[in-house]
Amino acid sequence: MEENINAESSHVKGSVLITGGSGLIGRYLTSLLLSEGYKVSHLSRKSNQFGRVRVFRWDPEKGILDPNVFEGIDYIIHLAGANIGEKRWTKARKKEIISSRVDSAKLLLKVVRDNTIDLKGFISASAIGYYGSLTSEHIYTEEDPPAADFLGNTCREWEEEADRFNETAVRTVKIRTAVVLEKSDSAMAKLLKPAKLGIFPVLGSGKQYMPWIHIED
């Protein structure tokens, strides 16, 4: 849907600020929102222009975020976070995976609270890693506790920080997604490459579940 990024709409339904807007989900969501008549802005470490999208620079590590970014914003969609599959999970990388999600949410909340910004909603990404990686016949629901492993703890801290937006009387939503697949994405390309060569490798033990969700869902 990226061809819709420059599409105009005669009626603006609302204004949305997205963190992590340059990622797979962020790009697709931006196109969808624009096509539905929303104004979209991005928070990014780089202030590159992205079609009709306003891009504002921020730096969660240094606590840099101009409160003027929130002028006219109705909703925040928080997708920012270091890619969990991009590098080895060294001690430093694990710290980065957590802080890129948690500290960025802390900064958003601080600026919203300190400047009495009136939002209609805060939507935070999360992941099914909340439930752990062990194969199980159990059908998980929102009532299940987080797993006592790295991903479970990461998602728990991530969601706890998102829940703090409830303190500002803002409706808060957390979405636990599986691996998101889209035909042009690098993750999908890695899965398809051996298949195109006539090789069909077994993932893991071959017995574990491999949950996924398509980008359109």
Question: Residue ranges of each PLM-predicted region?
Answer:
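Rossmann-fold scaffold of SDR-type NAD(P)-dependent oxidoreductases
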Residues: T19, I73-L79, S124-A125, R176
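NAD(P)-dependent short-chain dehydrogenase/reductase
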Residues: F165-K174, A178-P211
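A conserved structural motif in NAD(P)-dependent oxidoreductases
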Residues: P211-D217
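NAD(P)H-binding glycine-rich loop region in Rossmannoid oxidoreductase-like domains
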Residues: N48-Q49, R54-L107
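Conserved Rossmann-fold NAD(P)-dependent oxidoreductase catalytic core, especially the SDR/UDP-sugar
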Residues: A105-D149
